[in-house]
Amino acid sequence: MAFNMHNRNLLSLMHHSPRDVRYLLDLSRDLKRAKYTGTEQQHLKRKNIALIFEKTSTRTRCAFEVAAYDQGANVTYIDPNSSQIGHKESMKDTARVLGRMYDAIEYRGFKQEIVEELATYAGVPVFNGLTAEYHPTQMLADVLTMREHTDKPLHDITYAYLGDARNNMGNSLLLIGAKLGMDVRIAAPKALWPHDDHVAACKKFAEESGARITLTEDPKEAVKGVDFVHTDVWVSMGEPVEAWGERIKELLPYQVNVEIMKAAGNPRVKFMHCLPAFHNSETKVGKQIAEQYPNLKNGIEVTEDVFESPWNIAFEQAENRMHTIKAILVSTLADI
């Protein structure tokens, strides 16, 4: 290994240097190639990893499980219905129990302070699978995907995020781009921009890396000349459908549609989404929204014609969750 990341937490990427991030990206690329060519070697035999999910997931759970199994590790999936976490036992006590049984712990849930408390008391590496504030494993997958779809070096890559930028995706896309010297544009109503303290921290990173940061309320200005257009759902998991009315009114100008993609003015532009996406009315939630807002039957944050077009690389992005998570596990836990 190029340098030592052994037993290190991954909580937000705030404390990872650009060199750390590039190393994880390069290791992800190498592990992906090894899997595709059938030359992968197992470095995590006899390792045990606990997966705590207070929020449900498809991609994060599958990515951690397959990554661990590929490398010879064992996993235990823990959901709110199969544990005492938060009911009869605090997260602090849970951390001190699991840390004696497992080599690492993944947490996907709500507040950032919970995953940080886990890391404080577990005594083993803790990985943030998603909190309200940050989504670091997704960021590694996103940058790996962007690298795969352009010949440009990282500092020449330009991307825009459209939508609610106060959430984990807005925060994290701003952070990773600032760390790596990229050109990052955030387009959202000003009330939905990332918090001022987070923007200030990212601007400081940008000064060091040469990154360009733009926050604007004009979506077409944001996407002009970009290589990639990102978005995310407009409300978080668990929010009632009734809460969508005001959010739809605020964010409809930031819907990723054909007009927005063409406004990039780049024939090689690609669309990215961390998924799941409401791109039609075939899901239960999509159908409920379409019943109340018929103009959204063909997509909410992204339209069906964009999602089902060659612009969309969200499924490659989803696959790369597994390769980048594998890199995190190997770099942290492997005895090499």
From Swiss-Prot:
EC number of the protein: 2.1.3.3
EC category name: transferase
Cellular component, GO annotation: cytoplasm
Catalytic activity: carbamoyl phosphate + L-ornithine = L-citrulline + phosphate + H(+)
A GO biological-process term: arginine biosynthetic process via ornithine
Pathway: Amino-acid degradation; L-arginine degradation via ADI pathway; carbamoyl phosphate from L-arginine: step 2/2
Chain sites annotated for binding L-ornithine: N168, D232, S236, M237
Keywords of this entry: Arginine metabolism, Cytoplasm, Transferase
Function: Reversibly catalyzes the transfer of the carbamoyl group from carbamoyl phosphate (CP) to the N(epsilon) atom of ornithine (ORN) to produce L-citrulline.
Family: Belongs to the aspartate/ornithine carbamoyltransferase superfamily. OTCase family.
Protein name according to UniProt: Ornithine carbamoyltransferase, catabolic
Record organism: Ectopseudomonas mendocina
Record gene name: arcB
